[in-house]
Amino acid sequence: MTAPRQSTSATPDVAAAHDKILIVDFGSQVTQLIARRVREEGVYSEIVPFQKAEQAFTAMQPKAVILSGGPASVLEAGAPSAPMSIFTAGVPVLGICYGEQTMAQQLGGMVEGGHHREFGRAAIEITDDCALFEGVWKKGEQHDVWMSHGDRVTKLPEGFRGVARAAGSPIAIIADDTRKFYAMQFHPEVVHTPDGAKLIRNFVRKVAGLKGDWTMRAFREEAIEKIRAQVGQGRVICGLSGGVDSAVAAVLIHEAIGDQLTCVFVDHGLLRMAEAETVVSLFRDHYNIPLVHVDASKTFLGELAGVTDPELKRKTIGRLFIDVFDEEAKKIGGADFLAQGTLYPDVIESVSFTGGPSVTIKSHHNVGGLPARMKMKLVEPLRELFKDEVRALGRELGLPDVFVGRHPFPGPGLAIRCPGEITPEKLDILRQADAIYIEEIRRAGLYDTIWQAFAVLLPVKTVGVMGDGRTYEFVVGLRAVTSTDGMTADFYPFDMRFLGETATRIINEVKGVNRVVYDVTSKPPGTIEWE
């Protein structure tokens, strides 16, 4: 029996003791990247829609504010704006794209509809030095940035000066060094602006003077105290999916409350080669976490027989998972809390930019509907973290890197990597092909370079020749992409020798396959997964 240390104090907010930056969201598709860039500097950041910005600013008391981009025009009636209290509070403010335009207009400058719209890569010329550029850019230099705007600032507010210009933006960057207000027409948060992260670092560290103490070690200690304060002597059930998020959540909660936690691992028969055994061994044998392992593969595969529509596959798997999990929870009995691996992007995506509910947590793909049905309170220890931070926390908790660093795996598992009807035979073929592919990627030293790689079993057969005989067997598709966030992705440019050797192994070693193809589709227009 593992007994937790008793909490001596309650920690209502894991980030309360740290410097914080508030990010006001005006609807940009890449606002999450701003938060990630700030977090990379060891400073906690939080995103709120502009409608809630004043309330959040008062409650959060941030040391700096960043105004995001957005699709609106400040020239339209009723256009989104930042609370004026932000500009009078004495904190540094950084405006990005729409954030620059609303800052300029609200403080007395002028914005006009652009006759020269800029979308994509653009060159800017640095016309003067400022604190944002220290150690990065110098007067007279030209640099590539990523633009996405129609309107542009044409008259500076009082106290500002222009420090950069571009073909479509005569005032591409503005600076008020006295008030520490800075703004730029381009997007520094995206990788297409090569020096963008350095500019954000300068704003965070040099302009705002923040110390950067938001670390996973600090988060671990504070989250443990928060879990103990919330749970007390209650019991917690955590559904393990075999993925990184639920695994890290379970280990963190177990460190906080010991055997008050019971994990339920539902094996739906759609996992990768030896994955179920790995999960059981890690949690039951290595961490000694109470674990209920349910082999429900026959139930899932029986219900999925004949189902070909990908959305119906997902819904069927989700419904069955809830049924099985609910049944096991009743057997355990006495649980007061349900633990979920909700991440910060799930929280952000459920906040309506245009209005509506303030915050609605998006349910985890496997346990949606469980809290309402089971009448349990939620424990979500990772809800302030991005995926890369969860991996870092996992390493801090001692989870093996081979587990923490695994590529993303969808909740419905191999069901959506097997287009068409799912059968045990097809799943066996797919598991073997996928295992060989990943083994070859690891052997080539490419696993950590690639964001995600997997095999797909296509619902077609082709004619082949093996020895002196004709074959009519399945086609395996190989997929590998590079990405920073999964929002966009490029196919990985393997050399032909690697692809040839991998294809030869799969065809020779996996019975039922006589052809292998490689997917060279980027996202967009394609998605990373096939279904």
Curated annotation (Swiss-Prot):
Q: Which positions are annotated as binding ATP?
A: S241, G242, G243, V244, D245, S246, A247
The residues responsible for catalysis, as annotated, are C97, H187, E189
Metabolic or biological pathway, per its Swiss-Prot or TrEMBL entry = Purine metabolism; GMP biosynthesis; GMP from XMP (L-Gln route): step 1/1
**In what residue span(s) does the Glutamine amidotransferase type-1 domain sit?**
20-213
The record's catalysed reaction(s) read: XMP + L-glutamine + ATP + H2O = GMP + L-glutamate + AMP + diphosphate + 2 H(+)
UniProt-listed Pfam families: GATase, GMP_synt_C, NAD_synthase
Top-level division of the source organism's lineage = Bacteria
Q: Which PANTHER family match?
A: GMP SYNTHASE [GLUTAMINE-HYDROLYZING], GMP SYNTHASE-RELATED
This protein's assembly is summarised as: Homodimer.
User: What does this chain do?
Assistant: Catalyzes the synthesis of GMP from XMP.
Write down what this protein is called: GMP synthase [glutamine-hydrolyzing]
